Regions:
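Conserved hydrophobic positions within beta-strands
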Residues: 9-11
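Short, charged beta-turn/beta-strand-edge "cap" motif at the junction between a beta-strand
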Residues: 13, 54-59
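Short aromatic-glycine-enriched beta-strand elements
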Residues: 16-21
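Short nucleic-acid-contacting surface segments enriched for D/E, G, S/T with interspersed K/R
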Residues: 37-51
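Short, Lys/Arg- and Gly-enriched loop/turn segments at beta-strand edges
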Residues: 57-68
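Active-site metal-binding core of divalent-cation-utilizing nuclease and nuclease-like domains
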Residues: 75-82, 93, 97-143, 163-166, ...
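Nucleic-acid nuclease catalytic cores
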Residues: 149-159, 166-198, 220
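Domain-level recognition of nuclease-like catalytic cores that cleave nucleotide substrates
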Residues: 186-242
């Protein structure tokens, strides 16, 4: 994904989940929209370098959207969770994710399940000749980096994330593929695991989902700059203990 020209600034504060005050190079202070509703541990530190996307849409309440930040020297994190599905879909279409290659069609935000959910990506029509079932892909954005370099999800208790795992289990029971894709949006993360210390119920549900046949894949950036973000580097995933 190529970004439009972004404005670099310095983060002053993130507050009320959806707002971030940023100082631009000339000293102007602006308020940007923050799409990430999680705790954003480690990726919303005041003083960090950030990149904003401006908009000329007069209907927007906030002119700027917060897209990237620099958690440490030489690292970038894409904190705009609204881009995760598009980045994974782009990688699938380009053939960069082998486990999800060979499908004829891809649809987004399709209603499914017993709990009124929408699947992020639905891959249909096996074009490989291998006779694979349709694949329901749930995408989760990972920006929480632990001290050892592991990425962990979720960064806060998430009943919704556990619900999505239950829906994937139902999909598998019905004869389809159900796959949880951890989209690693932090260039410093080297592997992924469930954050059982933050949300033990999610970790237990993920263990149950794995035992039920749900697949898990972690993919990180092949390229991460303020001009381009390419998803598709498969990363190790450590399953929760039984």
């Amino acid at each position: 994904m190529d970004f439009p020209p972004l404005l670099e600034g310095r983060l002053l504060r993130r507050y009320k989940r959806f707002f971030a005050d940023v100082e631009l190079p000339g000293g102007e202070q602006v308020t940007a929209h923050c799409a990430n509703t999680g705790r954003m541990t480690g990726v919303c530190e005041p003083g960090s370098r950030v990149w904003l996307q401006p908009s000329d849409n007069p209907r927007r309440k906030l002119r700027y959207s917060w897209v990237l930040m620099e958690p440490a020297a030489g690292e970038l994190a894409c904190i705009d969770t609204g881009r995760a599905n598009a980045l994974v879909a782009e990688a699938i279409a380009a053939g960069r994710i082998a486990a999800l290659a060979g499908y004829a069609g891809l649809r987004r935000e399709v209603r499914y399940g017993a709990e009124g959910s929408r699947i992020d990506l639905l891959l249909e029509g096996d074009a490989s000749g291998a006779g694979r079932a349709d694949c329901y892909v749930e995408v989760k954005n990972v920006t929480l980096r632990l001290a050892d370099g592991d990425g962990a999800f979720p960064d806060a208790v998430s009943a919704r994330a556990s619900k999505h795992l239950r829906e994937l289990m139902h999909v598998v029971a019905a004869g389809h593929r159900g796959l949880l894709c951890f989209h690693v949006a932090h260039s410093g993360i080297r592997s992924v695991r469930a954050a059982g210390e933050i949300d033990p119920h999610y970790a237990a549900t993920l263990r149950e989902a794995l035992d039920s046949g749900v697949e898990v894949l972690a993919v990180g950036p092949l390229q991460a700059t303020a001009q381009r973000w390419l998803c598709g580097a498969e990363l190790p995933f450590t399953p929760p203990a039984r």
